[in-house]
A protein has these predicted regions:
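Divalent metal-dependent phosphate-bond-processing catalytic cores, especially two-metal-ion Mg2+/Mn2+ enzymes
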Residues: 2-29, 48-55, 66-75, 86, ...
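An amphipathic alpha-helix signature
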Residues: 16-20, 37-41, 64, 79, ...
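Short alpha-helical hairpin
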Residues: 27-46, 59
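Acidic/histidine metal-binding catalytic segments
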Residues: 35-39, 75-82, 114-127
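Histidine- and acidic-residue-rich, metal-dependent catalytic cores
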Residues: 46, 102-136, 188
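Active-site metal-coordination segments of metallo-dependent hydrolases
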Residues: 49-59, 91-103, 117
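His-Asp-centered metal-binding catalytic motifs of divalent-metal-dependent phosphohydrolases/nucleases
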Residues: 63, 77-93, 102, 127-131
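Secondary-structure capping and boundary motifs in well-ordered enzyme cores
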Residues: 78, 95-98, 119, 137
Length: 223
């Protein structure tokens, strides 16, 4: 049987191990709960779907790394990590309900995997929050997930250019003029936020660089 696209990724085994350890830690009855591995394999296969160029396995690796980096700010780091796994698990570039469908997937899969109702609800809430990336003051779990998801904006000029190019490839079916207008609107919306990054670390380390990167991209789009 040929290897799946996900299994060919160099971080596949590490990702699956991370998932299994995370779920076992969160299961209410770990001795009788299902094996987490099939759920993780399904998620990894989703993240490796061919329509993905930015929202890919590399993205989930990066977001999980950032949530670990910011873990001290979270009230429930495990809920944040689970939300990172699910936040774009359902992804179709031509649809607008990806976050909602991803949250619904979490609401189905996590109870089956032995995760309790309260934590499942928190994971789904966090996934839905990635629509706006605008958590309320005091939403510590939300700030960590949103900061981790937006950290790509603070990359080096080369890394940011690669990110922007990957986003464009995901929307390759959209005509240039329409893409430029839509992308510019998203950038303006993000730049209008009083703070992109709500954790102290994210604000201190990433805010200025991210705003500079986005402003540069916006200038190019509107040139």
């Amino acid at each position: 049987m040929p290897m799946s696209n996900a299994a060919a990724h160099p971080r596949y085994d590490a990702l699956l191990a991370h998932w299994c350890e995370l779920v076992r830690r969160c299961q209410e009855e770990p001795h009788t709960a299902p094996d987490p591995a099939p759920y993780g394999q399904d998620l990894l296969d989703r993240w490796a779907e061919p329509q993905r160029r930015y929202h890919s396995l590399d993205h989930i690796v990066a977001v999980l790394r950032r949530t670990t980096e910011l873990t001290a700010y979270a009230v429930d780091p495990d809920a944040v990590a689970l939300a990172a796994w699910f936040h774009d698990a359902v992804y179709r570039p031509d649809r607008s309900e990806n976050e909602e469908r991803s949250a619904q997937l979490a609401e189905r899969a996590l109870p089956e995997a032995g995760i309790g109702a309260d934590r499942t609800a928190e994971v789904a809430r966090l996934v839905r929050l990635t629509v706006s990336h605008d958590p309320d003051d005091g939403d510590r779990n939300g700030t960590v997930l949103c900061d981790a998801d937006l950290a790509v904006l603070a990359g080096s000029p080369t890394d940011y250019a690669e990110y922007a190019a990957a986003v464009r490839k995901e929307y390759g079916f959209v005509p240039d003029e329409d893409f430029r207008a839509g992308r510019a609107a998203i950038l303006r919306q993000l730049l209008a936020l009083p703070r992109l990054f709500r954790t102290p670390y994210g604000h201190d380390e990433w805010e200025a660089v991210a705003r500079r990167n986005m402003a540069t991209e916006l200038d190019l789009l509107e040139a």
